[in-house]
Regions:
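Polybasic, proline/glycine-rich intrinsically disordered low-complexity segments
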Residues: 245-251, 255
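Short recognition patches in nucleic-acid-associated and regulatory proteins
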Residues: 228-245
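Ferredoxin-type iron-sulfur electron-transfer modules and their immediate structural context
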Residues: 2-170, 176-222, 227, 257-259, ...
């Protein structure tokens, strides 16, 4: 191989590289999609959790929806009010006060409170157990196998003594727990105060049927509704009008709590200093981490 041949080869490759680069550059200009700079600015203000709590797949899609589709700027529960204000500033819109949304577990029955429980030997998940009859007497209450806990990316929900329990110090209100609950006992509710009242039951059967399957379930007696305008009995179950719920309602709410025979009206949310002081010496129940085992795992194979 002579230097002439080497030079021709190198020149040919260089020429091809220049041509291909030119083609790629032309194609890049031809097929370029202009991105609104506001989309990038909104993405920078979002927390990047990609939790889906806003109703979109991720932060990028939500940012595009805000800029291009005029979606609400207050949908990011992880970012909270400060994020909403920043996004509103980019979009040149005003935003009113943003209430934090948090989950409420509408069940208060721990293991010993549930009647009619039977041994379950299937897949240790709520979705699977919900397909099986006679897992427990109550067909409305928490199954306690932890689908909600596993769905939470912020470690804000654990199963304690068979009952899904929210850590409101960690919770950001993304709603992942509510989406995976097969019994729909978790609702995402606006918290007008750090602590709100909740009905910790979902059973819509008549009172005598409730007492047959649960020691603590709401029997729909109506005492709360007769005590406070915030309550209403619907389908044998006490409900709360959260639109009318404010801090000023506390006296009548406390009166209703005293009237509740089954003590199903409970306050949920961040603990107060008084609560922490009262419970500092109490021993906490064990946190249950369900094992993913079925009867097949314990089967002894022979042959």
């Amino acid at each position: 191989m002579t230097w002439v041949t080497i030079g021709l080869s190198a020149g040919t490759l260089l020429g091809m590289a220049i041509v291909v680069s030119g083609v790629f550059g032309w194609a890049n200009k031809l097929f370029q999609v202009d991105v609104d700079e506001r989309v990038l600015a909104v993405i920078d203000e979002l927390p990047g959790a990609n939790c889906g709590g806003c109703g979109y797949v991720g932060c990028g899609e939500y940012a595009e929806a805000v800029v291009l589709e005029k979606a609400e700027v207050t949908l990011c529960t992880v970012g909270g009010p400060s994020c909403a204000q920043a996004v509103a500033g980019i979009m040149g819109v005003e935003v009113s006060a943003v209430l934090p949304y948090r989950p409420i577990v509408h069940c208060g029955a721990h293991q010993e409170d549930r009647l009619g429980r039977n041994e379950y030997r299937g897949e240790m998940g709520c979705a699977a157990a919900n397909l099986v009859t006679d897992v427990q007497g109550c067909t409305y209450g928490c199954l306690g196998f932890g689908d909600c806990s596993r769905a939470c990316r912020f470690d804000a929900l654990q199963v304690v003594d068979g009952l899904a329990t929210v850590d409101y110090e960690k919770c950001v209100g993304c709603g992942a727990c509510a989406k995976v609950c097969p019994r729909n006992i978790i609702t995402i509710t606006p918290f007008k105060t750090d602590r709100v009242l909740a009905v910790s039951c979902s059973n819509k059967d008549k009172g005598k049927d409730v007492t047959a399957v649960c020691n603590v379930g709401c029997i729909g007696c109506g005492q709360c509704a007769r005590t406070s305008r915030l309550f209403k009995i619907e389908n044998n179950l006490s409900t709360i009008d959260y639109e009318a719920y404010t801090a000023d309602c506390l006296p009548e709410v406390l009166a209703a709590c005293e009237k509740c025979k089954r003590q199903r009206l409970v306050f949920v949310g961040k603990p107060t200093p008084e609560d922490l002081e009262k419970t500092k010496d109490e021993e906490l129940p064990d946190v249950v981490a369900p094992a993913f085992r079925t009867t097949v795992d314990d089967m002894e194979w022979r042959g």
